């Protein structure tokens, strides 16, 4: 018969195999403090030894994951020694930062500023603009290995942080290893993480935000303590870093924000015993740390962006003329000339770059759709130089003598003017007749000089309203002044539709009067003065103007979102979100066909398909649990259920928030947009495997039947407790083996460092939709 001490040892060993599932009660194995024990407490000795052994296993696994992560990311970092895919863009942006030249990009500046800083510290001066994929770095004197080392460093830290997230969330060692390995040995993460790109910064910031939030959540029973404040603050800081890198970081805000809202809803419950005052202290703490301060950090990077990029550059054309006036050496402001009445000018629409144009041809009566036009002279938009683009600016009282008093008078903001078409000797007008394409917009045409001076006088008056409408007496300049032309009588604004008119208008653009005079697409510029010969030809050096930060920031934000929505054209490597789930498409990053080398962005197929299966399985389990619980059927023990919804479903919702929004986006999308969702899916896989292997489910058919003898009070099957760890171990080893094999199998296209034969490339083409680039043998 076993002694009491032997029974105690066996009991402790069994207890040690049970993972802690309650997020709040799970403590880091680094901080285990043994209880004070009596001299003969054998059970406590065994428990302490087991905890120490467990802590050592976690540390050993963490170190191994970290070392392997650095090896996979830094392996042959110097290869290829050529520009790869979007290094064309982000390397160029780093050069522009170092040159101080203004550029435009769709992404916030944080990660790009970091790349520029690393390049600066490496001694790079920004002389090379990363012009083409395949350009040799050494030939152009670029310290590319040092610059690549920064994203490689951040990418190397992602798998270890994933490991820590799982550990702090209460999962066992095997679950931690599974989740971190799916990121560690993912080919797409490695490819994106070792090049001059932004995704390494995005993913590192994302996992750090999740890790900090988990640490903060575990301290919810000790609110307002120093550690509580610290983890809350760092959660907000890393959330700010995610959205300051790419706007998809907003999805991380949503993921953590949902959890925070649910937590606040729980605290609002009167059963918690919190006073209203105490609740609002909780609310304000989260508001300032998770919204207010992150927004300040976000603004700071734009402030740095504007203060560094002070010289005119390739991004000027995306911004308003008012913005461009703040940049030194801007050709538009440098070559601008003050406008006087009776100048002959060309007038350009800022949206379509079409010149205001007219010719003797008339509008057809009727149009093809049966609507009736005025039959007047056509006024169109023409995107090329032509003498029919010439218009003379006349004062509103031009036909009232004497004219001499009106010569050499500047045209000013808010003035009423007439526009005289030089080629046909007619004046511009609009009236209450529908335009060719827009029944609600007014037709633009011209009238004779006699009519303009007589009964049509009011119809030919237009007010010049500058985009910067603060000074009503501000003079207008060519190129540098943007304005809208508002009709005095009907209050419509002249606008150019980008859709070409039919053959009767020679495929030129429609000019019409838009009733919405607040839209940003109705602005024009006086592009040039024809035949200028007076003293205005002498250009004086202009000092850049000042513009408030908020005005520059808001304009840039609107431009970024507008340009982002315009990215709808077909791209040979774009893909749909539904393709990412099964890894249906990849992206050709770089190729050297003569050597049969290439870099092809492709995830680890086995890892991606495991994540896809886990997402579907979790969806089924969660739906079944909710539906059955409504019928009074408990499928999960209460402790397991709490952990499932607090932790596993948090990872699930993080995946959902980083994946589903792409289905409603109309812009071009690429495989790398899925990487944040893949990372969240990796966390979910580890959690789900532990749940499936270590926790029992009570069968619905046994509801109402007495609990069997082999099931304890928590719903754990004795058989399940005995063999669950073994099952999980087998599943983990099998999964990791397959994932590592798959990673090494596709490694040549991850690193681009190995020439493969045609047969070897063909064997790697598991799906016909994967388009590899290599020379086929004759």
From Swiss-Prot:
Keywords: Endoplasmic reticulum, Glycoprotein, Glycosyltransferase, Membrane, Repeat, Transferase, Transmembrane, Transmembrane helix. Glycans are attached at residues 40, 335. It is an enzyme of class 2 (transferase). Residues 1-44 are annotated as: Disordered. Its EC number is 2.4.1.109. One of its GO terms (biological process) is protein O-linked mannosylation. It is a multi-pass membrane protein. The keyword NADP does not apply. Pathway: Protein modification; protein glycosylation. The chain crosses the membrane at residues 60-80, 103-123, 145-165, 196-216, 223-243, 248-268, 288-308, 608-628, 644-664, 669-689, 726-746. Belongs to the glycosyltransferase 39 family. Transfers mannose from Dol-P-mannose to Ser or Thr residues on proteins. Required for normal cell wall and septum formation. This is Dolichyl-phosphate-mannose--protein mannosyltransferase 4.
């Amino acid at each position: 018969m076993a002694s009491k001490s032997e029974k105690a040892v066996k009991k402790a060993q069994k207890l040690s195999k049970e993972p802690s599932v309650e997020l709040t009660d799970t403590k880091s194995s680094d901080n285990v403090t043994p209880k004070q024990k009596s001299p003969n407490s054998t059970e406590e000795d065994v428990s302490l030894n087991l905890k120490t052994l467990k802590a050592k296993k976690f540390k050993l696994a963490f170190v191994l994951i970290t070392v392997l992560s650095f090896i996979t990311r830094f392996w042959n970092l110097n290869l290829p020694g050529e520009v790869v895919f979007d290094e064309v863009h982000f390397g160029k942006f780093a050069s522009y930062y170092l040159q101080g030249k203004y550029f435009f990009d769709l992404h916030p500046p944080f990660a790009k500023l970091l790349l520029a800083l690393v390049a600066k510290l490496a001694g790079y001066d920004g002389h090379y603009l990363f012009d083409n994929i395949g350009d040799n770095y050494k030939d152009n004197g670029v310290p590319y290995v040092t610059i690549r080392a920064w994203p490689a460093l951040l990418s190397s830290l992602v798998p270890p942080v994933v490991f820590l997230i799982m550990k702090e969330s209460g999962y066992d060692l095997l679950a931690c290893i599974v989740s971190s390995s799916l990121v560690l040995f993912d080919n797409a993460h490695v490819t994106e993480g070792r090049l001059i790109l932004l995704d390494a910064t995005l993913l590192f910031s994302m996992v750090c935000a999740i890790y900090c939030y988990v640490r903060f959540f575990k301290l919810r029973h000790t609110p307002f303590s120093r550690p509580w404040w610290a983890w809350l603050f760092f959660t907000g800081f890393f959330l700010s870093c995610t959205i300051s890198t790419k706007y998809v970081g907003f999805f991380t805000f949503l993921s953590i924000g949902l959890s925070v809202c649910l937590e606040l809803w729980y605290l609002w419950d009167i059963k918690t015993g919190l006073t209203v005052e105490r609740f609002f202290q909780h609310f304000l703490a989260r508001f300032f740390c998770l919204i207010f301060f992150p927004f300040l950090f976000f603004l700071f990077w734009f402030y740095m962006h504007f203060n560094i990029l002070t010289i005119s550059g390739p991004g000027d054309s995306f911004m308003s003329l008012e913005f461009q006036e703040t940049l030194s050496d801007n050709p538009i402001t440098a070559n601008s000339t003050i406008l006087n009445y009776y100048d002959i000018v060309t007038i350009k629409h800022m949206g379509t770059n079409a010149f205001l144009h007219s010719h003797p041809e008339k509008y057809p009566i009727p149009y093809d759709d049966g609507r009736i036009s005025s039959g007047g002279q056509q006024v169109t938009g023409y995107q090329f130089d032509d003498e029919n683009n010439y218009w003379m600016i006349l004062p509103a009282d031009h036909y009232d003598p004497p004219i001499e008093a009106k010569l050499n008078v500047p045209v000013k903001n808010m003035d009423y003017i007439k526009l005289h078409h030089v080629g046909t000797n007619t004046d511009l007008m609009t009236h209450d007749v529908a335009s060719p394409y827009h029944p609600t917009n007014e037709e633009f045409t011209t009238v004779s000089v006699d009519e303009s001076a007589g009964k049509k006088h009011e119809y030919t008056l237009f007010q010049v309203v500058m985009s910067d409408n603060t000074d009503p007496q501000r003079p207008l300049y060519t190129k540098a002044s943007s304005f809208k032309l508002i009709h005095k009588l009907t209050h419509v604004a002249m606008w150019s539709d980008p859709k070409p008119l039919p053959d009767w208008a020679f495929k030129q653009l429609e000019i019409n009067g838009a009733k919405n005079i607040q839209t940003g697409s109705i602005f024009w510029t006086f592009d040039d003065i024809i035949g200028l010969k007076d003293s205005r030809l002498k250009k004086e050096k202009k000092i850049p103007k000042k513009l408030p930060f908020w005005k520059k920031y808001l304009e840039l934000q609107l431009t970024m979102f507008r340009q982002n929505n315009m990215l709808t054209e077909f791209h040979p490597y774009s893909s749909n979100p539904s393709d990412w789930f099964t890894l249906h498409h990849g992206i050709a990053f770089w190729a050297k066909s003569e050597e049969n080398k290439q870099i092809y962005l492709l995830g680890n197929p086995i890892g991606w398909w495991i994540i896809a299966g886990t997402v579907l399985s979790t969806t089924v389990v969660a739906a079944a649990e909710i539906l059955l619980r409504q019928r009074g059927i408990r499928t999960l023990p209460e402790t397991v259920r709490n952990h499932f919804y607090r932790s596993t479903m948090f990872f699930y919702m993080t995946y959902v928030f980083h994946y589903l929004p792409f289905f409603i986006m109309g812009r071009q999308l690429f495989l790398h947009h899925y990487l944040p969702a893949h990372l969240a899916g990796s966390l979910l896989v580890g959690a789900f495997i532990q749940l499936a292997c270590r926790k029992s489910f009570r069968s619905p058919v046994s509801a109402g039947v007495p609990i069997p003898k082999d099931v304890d009070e928590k719903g754990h099957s004795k058989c399940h407790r005995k063999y669950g760890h073994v099952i999980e171990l087998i599943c983990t080893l099998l999964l990791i083996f397959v994932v590592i094999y798959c990673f090494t199998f596709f490694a040549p296209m991850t690193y681009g460092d190995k020439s493969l034969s045609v047969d070897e490339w063909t064997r790697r083409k598991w799906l016909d939709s994967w388009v590899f680039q290599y020379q086929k043998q004759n």
